[in-house]
């Protein structure tokens, strides 16, 4: 019993004299560690006579508790002292200018999307949104896609097990809009779309803006004038444009729009930027609009495509790699 008392007295004195956290940790290990003095005393209880074990066990436990408490208190004192010393050593020059707050910036795709929708908003088009998970009717069938069309294939479209799919274009929003609004109407649909494709100029997820106008006297000339005005407003300069005949199931006739794009070396080449056409009569019938009375035109564009042209980006994937160094250029 006297051994544990003398051990405790000396240990408490050593703890009180410790001048650093490292020394304190060494004492903790030497006293309360697996091979520590107090731990060894506990292990030796079994060798004592039965009538002495209880008193000895209580004394050892009391010593262990006292040492644990002393170690904790001394640690707190040393940590406070270290903090005070560090604060005393640090000085603040109150004449230095304050740090400016970090300012965030819009992602270049968001900037481009807002620019596109803003231009069409000024032309009287209403922005509409729809679900990214679509059914076959809104994504394909209502838009005059035949059952054998390649776009319905698994390698082009992301399907769910129940037959639903990730929309491959925002045209489904147009179908919903025409079902809820009577002509005359003009609207644009903007948002994410998904296709099974990934390379330097394609991404499995990208952003699209599609526009629609339905009226009694809309013509291809109206479509051409609308797109010419948009291209001029977006790039803030005039371009020579050409409309090439092309096939899209939901328009007839259909066309792809090219602009005469000037290369860094001064040469010019035709660059495809849009798809468009007059709304197919079957699409109008599918949403309850009389194609004998109404005609319409539609157009669509990839937002990333326009962002790449506006900001001079060569690789589409750079927009989605979250490299802050790249994104800060556009903030």
Swiss-Prot record:
Binding site for Mg(2+): 252
Cofactor binding, note field: Binds 2 magnesium ions per tetramer.
Record EC number: 6.1.1.20
GO molecular function term, any single one: tRNA binding
InterPro entries: aa-tRNA-synth_II, aa-tRNA-synth_II/BPL/LPL, Phe-tRNA_ligase_II_N, Phe_tRNA_ligase_alpha1_bac, Phenylalanyl-tRNA_Synthase, tRNA-bd_arm
Pfam families cross-referenced by the UniProt entry: Phe_tRNA-synt_N, tRNA-synt_2d
Keywords: Aminoacyl-tRNA synthetase, ATP-binding, Cytoplasm, Ligase, Magnesium, Metal-binding, Nucleotide-binding, Protein biosynthesis
Gene3D superfamilies: Bira Bifunctional Protein, Domain 2
CDD domains, per database record: PheRS_alpha_core
Record field: catalytic activity: tRNA(Phe) + L-phenylalanine + ATP = L-phenylalanyl-tRNA(Phe) + AMP + diphosphate + H(+)
GO annotation terms (biological process): phenylalanyl-tRNA aminoacylation
Requisite cofactors: Mg(2+)
Subcellular location: Cytoplasm
GO cellular component: cytoplasm
Similarity comment: family membership: Belongs to the class-II aminoacyl-tRNA synthetase family. Phe-tRNA synthetase alpha subunit type 1 subfamily.
PANTHER family cross-referenced by the UniProt entry: PHENYLALANINE--TRNA LIGASE, MITOCHONDRIAL, PHENYLALANYL-TRNA SYNTHETASE
Assembly notes: Tetramer of two alpha and two beta subunits.
Name recorded for this polypeptide: Phenylalanine--tRNA ligase alpha subunit
